[in-house]
Regions:
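PAPS-dependent sulfotransferase catalytic core
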Residues: 1-101, 106-107, 124, 138, ...
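Phosphate- and divalent-cation-binding pockets in alpha/beta enzyme and binding domains
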Residues: 31, 113, 120, 140, ...
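Structured helix-beta-strand junction loops
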Residues: 39, 127, 255-256
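The conserved 3'-phosphoadenosine-5'-phosphosulfate
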Residues: 47-48, 135, 182-273
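Soluble or luminal CAZymes and related metallo-dependent hydrolases
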Residues: 64-71, 80, 109-116, 172-180, ...
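PAPS-dependent sulfotransferase catalytic domain
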Residues: 85-94, 116-123, 127-132, 139-207, ...
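Surface-exposed cleft-lining segments at the edges of enzyme active sites
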Residues: 105-110, 160-172, 199, 233-247
């Protein structure tokens, strides 16, 4: 491999994830992570946001944790007490034994991975699946700005600060759903990329979760749903979007909004592509 660092020429890939929740940020990935976390047939990494593939070769990055692939794969190993706890919870909730069939993890920055990284991920696990969540670009951008600029700040944030944030390259990329979808589709096997709708988390959480579980190939039962089904996770402040910011975003993201609506028209309630 040229991009993903390894200690050996033939690393043990048994722990390589079977699926990745790709993001982007503020689209419901935390909700999805916690609602899949205790499914008896899924071993989901204990940590939401491992950042492994996003921080390759960047030891100075604040989220850098795993120097090489073997370290990352080793982090999927469950401690005895973790496995025992999952056995107990699964038996209590659904009379099911915790017996994971698939591994997965969720890092919302993976939606924007360079294609050379995506290609090596798929080379490691040709059958890997990905999930991209779709949210109205204006609402997603505002939610992300509240989390980044407003949360924990004692000072009011002015329009110019918001404008600078929204016009940044990273934020523009996160609104460009067609590009992130195309990049992953070019490398994943056919129908191994699921496009999910953020609004279904609110309007139809149970059917949406069932759709995701069917896509992943695990058993779907209402008994497997947990208390997080109707809980808003990782929320930002309730501050409503000022009209001047809404108008600015609607103008800035006009093409992205049109593309988003076309995608929704194509996928309906969500589907694999």
């Amino acid at each position: 491999m040229n991009v993903i660092p390894t200690r050996t020429d033939r690393p043990d890939l048994r722990n390589f994830p079977d699926f990745l929740i790709l993001g982007p940020q503020r689209t419901g990935t935390t909700w999805l992570f916690f609602n899949l976390h205790l499914h008896p047939e899924i071993l989901l990494h204990r940590m939401k946001e491992t950042y492994f593939f996003s921080t390759l070769g960047k030891p100075e990055h604040p989220h850098f944790r795993y120097p090489c692939l073997e370290d990352y794969l080793g982090s999927f190993d469950e401690r005895f007490w973790e496995r025992l706890k999952k056995h107990y919870i699964c038996l209590r909730k659904s009379l099911s034994v915790y017996r994971p069939k698939i591994h997965g993890e969720a890092t919302a920055s993976y939606a924007l991975l360079p294609e050379e990284v995506i290609a090596e991920i798929v080379a490691c696990k040709p059958g890997i699946k990905g999930i991209i969540m779709l949210r109205d670009p204006v609402e997603r951008a505002w939610s992300h700005a509240k989390k980044t600029l407003v949360r924990g700040s004692s000072e009011p944030v002015g329009f110019e600060k918001f404008r600078e944030y929204f016009e940044s390259t990273g934020q523009r990329q996160r609104a460009d759903y067609p590009s992130m979808i195309a990049a992953w589709k070019r490398h994943l096997a056919p129908v191994h990329l699921y496009l999910g709708r953020y609004d279904r988390i609110v309007s139809a959480p149970s059917p949406f979760l069932e759709d995701v579980e069917r896509f992943l190939g695990v058993t779907t039962k209402a008994l497997f749903f947990n208390r997080h089904l109707t809980i808003k996770l990782n929320p930002t402040s309730d501050a409503s979007m000022p009209e001047d910011i809404r108008r600015f975003l609607e103008d800035l993201l006009a093409n992205d909004i049109d593309a988003y609506r076309r995608i929704l028209s194509d996928i309906g309630d969500g589907r694999a592509v």
